[in-house]
Amino acid sequence: MNDKTHLGHTARKRFGQNFLHDDYIIDSIVGAIAPQWEDNIVEIGPGLGALTEPVASKVKCLNVIELDRDLAARLAEHPVLGDKLNITQADALQFDFGKLASTERPLRVFGNLPYNISTPLMFHLFEYADKISDMHFMLQKEVVNRLCAGPNCKAYGRLTVMAQYYCRIIPVLEVPPTAFKPAPKVDSAVVRLEPYDTPPFIAKSLKCLTQVCSMAFNQRRKTIRNGLRDLLSIEQLQEIGIDTTKRAENISVEEYVNIANYVFDLKENK
């Protein structure tokens, strides 16, 4: 049996599959999630059920979204959990998470995310932030560093700003490659994201905030006045209180929101 086969299933590279098997890490993650019986909880990419089984044992019902139809079928036939699982065979990047949430029962989301889609998947989930109470994800350690970064460091980028706009970010634990089969070539980490009921800084238009961040970080080595020159003049940036000699990685989340709100007001007043 090669090192890509675990519990009779061969990991598929196109799905970014690395199966967690370390009991200590599994127990630590489940402890961090702390599932409760009545939770409205969903797992993305349950795989072979390393997290599915212990979480499902603590809740009334567990929603799972699995792209791999073989793994979805395997879970449906699980001798113990089959009746507890609400299984959707689908691409989480296209899935409407709003269908699973309600005002009374916001979603709790967790998963060992495929590293090849983790960033776009988080951006997709941010669209449902008002319907989610918390998220626990296993990610590439580099991505967790980006989520937690502050201004003035290399890890700080568009993902940082958007994640910290929507959520409080809490690192949980680091995970070595040996905890997986097959072992990835990178270190991993678990992170908790708690969407704010009300963000600390309110963007008038999320579309404008996304546009500003994209423009700034697409040219991150340029000063902010050059990176955003198609949107705002030096004088306008100075009017907002932005140091125009700074680069994208030196601008705080609050400052990005202020820039986006200024851009929005300009468009509204045209």
Curated annotation (Swiss-Prot):
<keyword id="KW-0808">Transferase</keyword>
<keyword id="KW-0949">S-adenosyl-L-methionine</keyword>
<dbReference type="InterPro" id="IPR011530">
    <property type="entry name" value="rRNA_adenine_dimethylase"/>
</dbReference>
<dbReference type="InterPro" id="IPR020596">
    <property type="entry name" value="rRNA_Ade_Mease_Trfase_CS"/>
</dbReference>
<dbReference type="GO" id="GO:0003723">
    <property type="term" value="F:RNA binding"/>
</dbReference>
<dbReference type="Pfam" id="PF00398">
    <property type="entry name" value="RrnaAD"/>
</dbReference>
<feature type="binding site">
    <location>
        <position position="91"/>
    </location>
    <ligand>
        <name>S-adenosyl-L-methionine</name>
    </ligand>
</feature>
<feature type="binding site">
    <location>
        <position position="45"/>
    </location>
    <ligand>
        <name>S-adenosyl-L-methionine</name>
    </ligand>
</feature>
<feature type="binding site">
    <location>
        <position position="20"/>
    </location>
    <ligand>
        <name>S-adenosyl-L-methionine</name>
    </ligand>
</feature>
<comment type="similarity">
    <text>Belongs to the class I-like SAM-binding methyltransferase superfamily. rRNA adenine N(6)-methyltransferase family. RsmA subfamily.</text>
</comment>
<protein>
    <recommendedName>
        <fullName>Ribosomal RNA small subunit methyltransferase A</fullName>
        <ecNumber>2.1.1.182</ecNumber>
    </recommendedName>
</protein>
<comment type="function">
    <text>Specifically dimethylates two adjacent adenosines (A1518 and A1519) in the loop of a conserved hairpin near the 3'-end of 16S rRNA in the 30S particle. May play a critical role in biogenesis of 30S subunits.</text>
</comment>
<feature type="binding site">
    <location>
        <position position="112"/>
    </location>
    <ligand>
        <name>S-adenosyl-L-methionine</name>
    </ligand>
</feature>
<dbReference type="GO" id="GO:0052908">
    <property type="term" value="F:16S rRNA (adenine(1518)-N(6)/adenine(1519)-N(6))-dimethyltransferase activity"/>
</dbReference>
<dbReference type="InterPro" id="IPR001737">
    <property type="entry name" value="KsgA/Erm"/>
</dbReference>
<feature type="binding site">
    <location>
        <position position="18"/>
    </location>
    <ligand>
        <name>S-adenosyl-L-methionine</name>
    </ligand>
</feature>
<feature type="binding site">
    <location>
        <position position="66"/>
    </location>
    <ligand>
        <name>S-adenosyl-L-methionine</name>
    </ligand>
</feature>
<dbReference type="InterPro" id="IPR020598">
    <property type="entry name" value="rRNA_Ade_methylase_Trfase_N"/>
</dbReference>
<keyword id="KW-0963">Cytoplasm</keyword>
<dbReference type="GO" id="GO:0005829">
    <property type="term" value="C:cytosol"/>
</dbReference>
<keyword id="KW-0698">rRNA processing</keyword>
<keyword id="KW-0489">Methyltransferase</keyword>
<dbReference type="InterPro" id="IPR023165">
    <property type="entry name" value="rRNA_Ade_diMease-like_C"/>
</dbReference>
<dbReference type="InterPro" id="IPR029063">
    <property type="entry name" value="SAM-dependent_MTases_sf"/>
</dbReference>
<keyword id="KW-0694">RNA-binding</keyword>
